[in-house]
């Protein structure tokens, strides 16, 4: 019996004492006024969702232009009394070229394969607008 080995993706980030974030060997992002770790988590969820949609769309011969937004609620969970993200609403607006008849299928694959969303305890609620 042949066993398959899963791909492994490893990531690293550094934050200096001034709050600047750096990808080792890559670009640096200055600390943005008003941005909390909670905002960054929601931004990561939107970015990952768009990137996942783009990946699946390109595999079927489409280019993607997309934007998105997310809103989240953090409060004490009833299950364990810890503060956590208990609701995440994501809206993605995307345009495919050429247009795709199976946009709902692409959106479903994007939701499934966004590892940020898959890593959360709460299941994000998505609203896809794909044309």
Residues of each region from the PLM?
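Extended beta-strand/beta-hairpin segments
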Residues: 1-46, 50-131
């Amino acid at each position: 019996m042949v066993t398959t080995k899963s791909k492994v993706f490893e990531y690293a980030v550094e934050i200096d004492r001034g709050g600047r974030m750096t990808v080792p060997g890559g670009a640096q992002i200055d600390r943005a006024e008003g941005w909390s770790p909670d905002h960054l988590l929601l931004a990561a969820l939107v970015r990952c969702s768009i990137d996942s949609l783009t990946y699946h769309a390109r595999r079927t011969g489409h280019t993607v232009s997309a934007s998105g937004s997310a809103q989240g609620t953090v409060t004490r969970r009833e299950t364990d009394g810890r503060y956590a993200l208990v609701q995440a609403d994501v809206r993605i607006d995307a345009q495919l070229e050429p247009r795709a008849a199976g946009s709902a299928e692409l959106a479903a694959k994007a939701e499934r394969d966004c590892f940020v969303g898959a890593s959360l305890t709460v299941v994000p609620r998505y609203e896809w607008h794909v044309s």
